């Protein structure tokens, strides 16, 4: 089921903080199953003898993917709040990062069952799982050890890599339109101040 092409393939893994009791692991990957051409997050249960994964549950599907696999993102991480955070890539498609109805170029925050977590800021016309938008290709999420504040790290276009403090409903500012204009700055603080 893993479609390993270009920047796509096995993209990320998170172990449930309650693993000792529920044995859940979460895997992000590029999928070609039954003609699918997306990135997705799947929850599995790891057998006690560590020999097999069972109880597959595709929690987040339809994360945008292009044939080269470029900007697939898909980095899952549990936060200190107990929710699963997932950084997604924009699939090198200019309209994805600022579109609240599309999961590309976002940070998602979900429950163990794949639903939008309480406290996500619903953007007009938006998807309930979106925590922030306006990202290019999130490669990591980290949490402050004392305050629990969330931060993302992402690649810029040959320069301009950035770390962004994440706030519910926030906008990281990546907006490479028209087309996919990579000469624009990663963050336009005038247009997207949060």
Annotated model-derived regions:
Residues 1-94, 140-143, 147-156:
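Acidic, Gly/Ser/Thr-rich repeat motifs that build Ca2+-stabilized beta-propeller blades
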Residues 3, 8-10, 18-20, 90-194:
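Beta-propeller domain segments
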């Amino acid at each position: 089921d893993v479609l390993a092409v270009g920047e796509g393939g096995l993209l990320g893994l998170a172990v449930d903080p309650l693993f000792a009791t529920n044995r859940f692991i979460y895997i992000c990957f590029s999928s070609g199953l039954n003609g699918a051409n997306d990135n997705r997050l799947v929850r599995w249960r790891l057998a006690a003898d560590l020999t097999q994964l069972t109880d597959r549950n595709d929690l987040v599907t339809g994360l945008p993917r292009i044939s080269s696999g470029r900007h697939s993102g898909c980095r899952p991480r549990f936060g200190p709040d107990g929710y699963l955070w997932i950084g997604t890539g924009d699939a090198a498609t200019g309209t994805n990062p600022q579109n609240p109805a599309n999961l590309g170029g976002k940070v998602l925050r979900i429950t163990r069952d794949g639903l939008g977590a309480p406290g996500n800021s619903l953007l007009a016309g938006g998807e309930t799982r979106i925590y922030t938008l306006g990202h290019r290709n999130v490669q990591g999420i980290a949490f402050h050890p004392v305050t629990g504040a969330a931060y993302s790290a992402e690649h810029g276009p040959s320069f301009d890599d950035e770390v962004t403090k994440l706030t519910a409903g926030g906008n990281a500012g990546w907006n490479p339109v028209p087309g996919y204009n990579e000469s624009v700055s990663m963050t336009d603080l005038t247009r997207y101040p949060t």
